[in-house]
Amino acid sequence: MGELRSSVAESFSLTQGGPLYRLQLRFGHAQEERARILRRALFAMVVAWVPLLVLSTINGSAYGTQLQIPFLHDFAVNVRFLVALPILILAESSIDRKWRLLVLHFLRSGLVQEPELPSFEAVIRRVTRLRDSVLPEAIIAAVAYSSFLFGAHTEALMGSASNWHAPGLGSSLGLSLAGWWFNIISAPFFRFLLLRWMWRMFLWALFLWHVSKIGLRLVATHTDLAAGLGFLSLGQKRFSPIVFAGGAVVASQVGNAIAYDGATLAGMKFVLIGYGVFAILLLVAPLLVTTPTLIKAKAQAVLSYGALVTSHNQSFATKWVDGYAPQGDEILGNHDPSSLIDLGSSFQVV
């Protein structure tokens, strides 16, 4: 049987869709060429970071000793918009390509057989419709702006320390122009991109969950120890830049707390441990949705392979242990011990 092909699977994407993508497409900024991706990342940095630098320089809070936290000394803000923000954009292309390859591998590996192809394509179309829906990104945007709308303007502040965000006050009162830009434009924009990645991860997990229900041709003796689904871990590894971006933001905020607010590294251990646990769960969770299917495949294989191994072992024992081997047959050089070991090894994999 030849390799299955599907134009629906070949066009699979979790990043090339949604209201913001369509807006970028209209202005010619959504193409996947490397130069255009770099321009998108640079444009995002220009919008989020450059105005903060210009406005804080104008009011004298970009550098110097008159403030405890001048703009250029604020680890959290600079790491967020000069390191994490471009990563969230630059990672889109490589992660999306890897996801597409994994989707196609379901067909190339024979996990999806021809009778299940329509169901497989239906799952892709369902996930694509969710990706293109306006409502999810609208909710993400609302959440991203919620802290500003409800008056929580303290994201860049460190206790009562004077800073570029609200010089001399250390509160949300009397925000500088740079502080207003941060709260209205920069911070919500970053949160939107980060939350949109969480949405994409949910879509990927949803795809895997639905696909695991369509009747995959799983092989319990597969040497990847996951019945042939071990390749899915490659997609989670490719997601590591997003985890790194989040980790950089957390680390920079911890740096601010230690440098300017008198915190200690030991005192911040729960923050660091908490993010570490969250990052692990984020990487592992999409794979966990296949667990019920794998458990079912294992249970079925234990019975079927167990019966086969039992029958083979009984025949081997009858022939070679009980002494019923044909006249002239010798165990040395015979294929029976080899088949016994091979079948036993397969059962151990199960």
Give residue spans per PLM region.
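C-terminal structured domains
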Residues: M268-V284, L288, P292
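Membrane-water interface at loop-to-transmembrane-helix junctions
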Residues: D224-I242, A263-I273
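Juxtamembrane inter-helical linkers in multi-pass membrane proteins
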Residues: L104-V123, N163-S171, A205-L232, T291-D329, ...
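Terminal membrane-anchoring module of integral membrane proteins
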Residues: F244-I258, A263-V277, A307-S311, S315, ...
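Alpha-helical bilayer-embedded segments of polytopic membrane proteins, i.e.
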Residues: R39-V50, K237-A248, Y275
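Generic, well-ordered alpha-helical scaffold segments in large soluble proteins
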Residues: L53, T57, L101-H105, S109, ...
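Alpha-helical transmembrane segments and their membrane-interface junctions
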Residues: V54-S56, P136-A161, P241-Y260, L340-V350
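Transmembrane-helix bundle segments that line or gate the permeation/cavity pathway
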Residues: M1-L218
